[in-house]
Amino acid sequence: MQNDETQSFLADETGQPSNAWLNEQALLLFNFFGPAALNPKGGFWALGRTGDPLRPSFAAQEVQPLHNATRFVHCFSLAHRFGFAGAERMIDQGLEFIWKQHRDAQHGGYYWAVSNDGVIDPAKQAYGHAFVLLAAAAAKEVMHPLADRLLDDIVEVIEQRFWEPERGASREEFSADWQALSTYRGQNSNMHLTEALIAAFAVTKDTMFLQKAEEIAYLIIDRHARSAQWRVPEHFD
């Protein structure tokens, strides 16, 4: 429930909905994460509350999960549309890191966690792959020259490895060589995949993406939530 203060942020002087406050907050975040998050070795730093990079100790590895670089690409593709200076550099570095560090050139797919020295966690997670698709779609929307390569690759991986047509949803997790790690299914990864599929449809107009998004919505909402008095189950098999 919104209070009066929140409502005033989200409305203009006439009381009509406004994006001005949201745009201001987005700009603050772009400025906060901007160049400070760029790791000179590749990928991105996590930042502390003051905006300084949280560099690991000398002996620690700089672990970078897949959803880190992919989210940076997505967010700074939006920043590019805002005209934010330096957004292209963030997108460049993110796409290069995803392709060169996270991508498994031998077995296909994308490792869950890596450092600049190699693979930390070789698992192939649906959650992370959903964000690869989102990053590729966002980069394509701003016409980045590396977007199509990533988009073509991740679409093939999702179609061949993750998608279960008989269920209308994604499998959850695999080993590096695509051995299933569990029978678990989750709403969270499928929710993020739905977002990414809609984004991919928006930039390609390929109805295959929209059809998959609708199938997930049918499973999670029309079947699971309906049978649970419209509560959305998080975990299922």
Protein language model annotation of sequence segments:
Residues 1-237:
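Glycan-recognition and catalytic cores of secretory/periplasmic carbohydrate-active enzymes
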